Amino acid sequence: MIVRALRAHARGATGDIVLLWVVAAAFVLSTSMATSVPAELAEAPAGVRAALSAPFSAVLATYGAVLAAVYASFRYTVDRRDGVIAQRLMLHPRWVTLLSRTLGSALGGAVVALAGLAGGHIALAVAMGGVPVGWASVGSALAVGAGAGLWGLGAGIVVQNHLVALFVASMSLGSAVLVAMFWSAAAHGFPLIALLDAFGFDVTAVGVSPADGSGGSVPVAVGWMLAALVAGGVTFMKRDVT
């Protein structure tokens, strides 16, 4: 039953226009970082270039996370509007459909994050004459993107309206960067900063001081993801989706 639901979701993903557009947006947005890199850095030693490019990993992960949440929320609201969710519920139990959507949102979020990483590294390679790729940070960025996809799915299920869901999904993550400008300690309690910190990113690159945090980013991140999944899951199981 679960396998059939996953296969049906995978077949629908082959023509996922929403994913295509968000992946393109992540790639283009990440390549824009090249405009902020001074041309003189291309002639700097390799060690200097590597040190200066390290903070960009957190920035790229931030871009990817926000857009991953946007993708997952919009993907759900579009499918609900077009009757795809109602059709799937005629074939599978609600919990099976919810599970397949959850896995699909996490995978889609990771794909969006990967596109952002690719665009960013290409931009840095062109602007700085080549920089090493930290494969550990790549895996962490994909995990952050997957987590953000789950967050976006929860927002989409609860809110349902297209525009409102897009706003809630993006601002509930991106607002952490704005809060960090005025109250760095409070920013550690936001989902985005907790995710970045939990997966080892240098949060100082997005304006947050590690000294301001309590060191409990992992339970905070897990708590936020569980809250999003529980809220979305309960709503999905009880609400009419037609």
Label each PLM-derived region with a short phrase.
Residues 87-95:
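Short helix-to-coil transition segments within interhelical loops
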Residues 220-242:
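Junction motif at the cytosolic side of a transmembrane helix
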Residues 74, 78-82:
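Short helix-terminus and kink motifs of transmembrane alpha helices
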Residues 17-19, 23-74, 98-163, 169-171, ...:
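Secretory targeting signals
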Residues 2-14:
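A short amphipathic helical element positioned immediately N-terminal to and/or at the very start
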Residues 178-197:
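Extracellular/periplasmic helix-loop junction at the C-terminal end of a transmembrane helix
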Residues 12, 77, 89, 152, ...:
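Helix-capping/transition residues at the boundaries of transmembrane alpha-helices
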